[in-house]
Amino acid sequence: DGGEPAAPLWFGPRV
């Protein structure tokens, strides 16, 4: 994305 905080790895980080 680019608007949400990066989630944990097991969630799939948004970068």
Swiss-Prot record:
Expressed in which tissues: Found in the abdominal ganglia and perisympathetic organs. Not detected in the thoracic ganglia, subesophageal ganglion, corpora cardiaca, corpora allata, hypocerebral ganglion or frontal ganglion.
Modified residues (Valine amide): 15
Protein name, per record: Pyrokinin
Biological role: Myoactive.
One GO BP annotation of this record: neuropeptide signaling pathway
Chief subcellular location: secreted
GO cellular component, one term: extracellular region
Origin superkingdom: Eukaryota
Keywords, sorted A to Z: Amidation, Neuropeptide, Secreted
Family that this chain belongs to: Belongs to the pyrokinin family.
Organism: Locusta migratoria (Migratory locust)
Subcellular localization: Secreted
